[in-house]
Amino acid sequence: MVKDVTQFNQYLTEEVVEDYSDGIIGRREALRRLGMLGLTAALAGSLLAACDAAGQGSASEPATGTPAGSVPAGPSARSTESITFAGPQDRKLQGAWAAADNPRGAVLVIHENRGLTDHIRSVTGRLAASGYSSLAVDLLSEEGGTASFTDEAEVTAALNSVPDSRFVADMKAAIGELETRAVDAKIGAVGFCFGGGMVWSLLAAGEPRLAAAAPFYGPLPDGADFAGSPNAAVLGVYAEQDERVNATREKAAEALEKARLTHEIVTFPNAGHAFFNDTGQRYNPAAAAAAYQKLIDWFGSHLG
């Protein structure tokens, strides 16, 4: 089942086009990825042609890899443990778990559209090093887990085929697992890009167990209503140069105000989409360091 094109399918499509326009992937790869998301060759070609007409995009294959000298924001990551736990309808969910020595709280980590990667494991371990026992859930557990795919474009396409209701159910099950592993701890959630959108979706679905949430540059679901998550203090993280996601920033603030949730919207200057990912081409060390400190301060205020 393909998602509603007006929501996450559109978001994932725009991510591919943006990667092409920024020169991160070439035309052939962009066409391949758009096709995997269900676009016809004609539509995919027209989207890339619009970038070409604007003087953007790369017909050749660009350089790939992590920017030289990238240092992740925050402390050195604790090691994570691969775990399985009970999910909805007798399904088994996969995840990465990192326990803090003296937990101040517990955090659910939601991955980007590349799945449960080493980068997300690192974020999970860094949060544990900062005092928050953390669990990153693999939202492709039913498909065999992220590790069962050899191509990140296949991961994105697989995520695109899953109904949002299953994602929400799996995230709620992961919160239940956190309750078991971190007894009496207040629980927060953080997600990045696609995962940021998932945090918004979790809040909109209603999750009273959340005491804090921090969606990083994630798309806001249409008609989001956060009344069912009355206990969540929400830190919305945006990037100054991320016009695509920033288009929903005002609506997010309005929805938070309407639900009367404690919240703060922060936009980091001179930073683009995915600026926190130290393995990506848009990594901004200064913005990432500031965002991590802001996140830990937020959790400190609302989790302990």
Label each PLM-derived region with a short phrase.
Residues 1-29, 43:
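N-terminal secretory signal peptides
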Residues 24-32, 41-65:
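N-terminal twin-arginine translocation
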Residues 64-99:
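N-terminal cap/lid segment of alpha/beta-hydrolase-fold proteins
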Residues 104-112:
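Short beta-strand element of the alpha/beta-hydrolase
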Residues 156-180:
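Alpha/beta-hydrolase active-site loop
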Residues 182-192:
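Alpha/beta-hydrolase fold nucleophile elbow
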Residues 236-238:
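Short beta-strand/loop motif that positions the catalytic acidic residue
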Residues 257, 262-304:
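C-terminal catalytic histidine-bearing segment of alpha/beta-hydrolase fold enzymes
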